[in-house]
């Protein structure tokens, strides 16, 4: 069944105005499908217009995600003291998420076995959404068995991340909203960068119009500008590209996008 598609621009983010308008106009101008030029897969491959993403691209992606780590030393010191439970919720996040955690040095990572492999029927959940508490039922059960500190869940197409953290005093697990985790990651990334390298005078923290105003307070605390954009990671990507093209502004963080690449929303990098 056709389920739509996403179109990305050369910066790696989904395209934004005016490019979206141009594509829409071209599509709407078609009055007879028989006039549309087509090309078979073999011809497209021969002309370098068709490429199946494989291991080489996977490796580049993983390398980019790992490059976003701001303090590997902190991970090295704590990797044996942190226990993580992870579930891909029958989706696509299993291999990349586990690979990144392993290569960064996290040794105590447990995957929910019932939800490890891809399954479009999602037999263990009625709604495979990491923002829903029900999706964490098996993950939290395993977390209690393993005395885990952190429970992570990615949605089926691995572009959203759900988080539960353990209260060290009570032993209870509490969920973090996207605004909570975004601010925690943002404060950590910017704070670490300040401590290690200092912050640029034109540093910017980006949030969408629906994200928490706590981001404003974080930006004020670090003395950097707060930039507000429309809802959607593509608009964060658009602002990043604007910074790069104009030389006015240095991207530090966006809720919740760590660095300039990869630009789409992505649970593995988070």
Language-model features, listed with the residues they occupy:
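Flexible loop/turn segments at secondary-structure boundaries
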Residues: 1, 92-94, 118-121, 158-162, ...
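Short Gly/Thr/Asp-enriched flexible loops that form oxyanion-binding sites at enzyme active sites
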Residues: 2-9, 159-178
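Gly/Ser/Thr-enriched, mixed-charge loops and adjacent short helices
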Residues: 3-135, 142-143
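Proline/glycine-rich low-complexity loops and linkers
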Residues: 26-53, 167-254
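Short, surface-exposed connector motifs at secondary-structure boundaries
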Residues: 74-83, 147, 195-203, 222
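Accessory "access/gating" subregions that flank catalytic or transport cores
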Residues: 86, 102, 139-154, 162-166
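Conserved small/polar residues in nucleotide/adenosyl-binding loops
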Residues: 259-266
């Amino acid at each position: 069944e056709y389920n739509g598609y996403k179109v990305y621009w050369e910066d790696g983010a989904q395209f934004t105005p005016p490019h979206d308008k141009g594509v829409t106009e071209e599509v709407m101008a078609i009055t007879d499908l028989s006039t549309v030029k087509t090309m078979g897969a073999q011809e497209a491959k021969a002309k370098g217009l068709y490429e199946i993403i494989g291991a080489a691209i996977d490796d580049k992606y993983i390398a980019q995600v790992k490059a976003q780590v701001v303090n590997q030393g902190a991970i090295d010191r704590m990797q044996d003291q942190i226990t993580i439970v992870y579930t891909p919720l029958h989706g696509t996040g299993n291999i990349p998420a586990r690979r990144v955690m392993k290569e960064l040095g996290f040794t105590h990572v447990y995957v929910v076995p019932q939800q490890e492999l891809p399954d479009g029927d999602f037999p263990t959940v009625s709604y495979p959404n990491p923002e829903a508490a029900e999706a964490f039922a098996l993950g939290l059960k395993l977390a209690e068995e393993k005395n885990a500190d952190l429970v992570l869940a990615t949605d089926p197409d691995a572009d959203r991340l759900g988080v539960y953290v353990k209260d060290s005093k009570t032993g209870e697990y509490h969920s973090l909203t996207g605004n909570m985790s975004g601010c925690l990651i943002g404060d950590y990334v910017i704070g670490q960068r300040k401590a290690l390298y200092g912050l640029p005078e034109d540093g910017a923290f980006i949030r969408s119009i629906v994200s928490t105003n706590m981001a404003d307070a974080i930006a004020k605390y670090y003395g950097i500008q707060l930039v507000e954009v429309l809802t959607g990671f593509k608009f964060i990507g658009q602002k990043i590209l604007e910074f790069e093209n104009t030389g006015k502004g240095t991207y530090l963080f966006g809720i919740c996008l760590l660095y300039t690449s990869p630009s789409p929303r992505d649970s593995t990098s988070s």
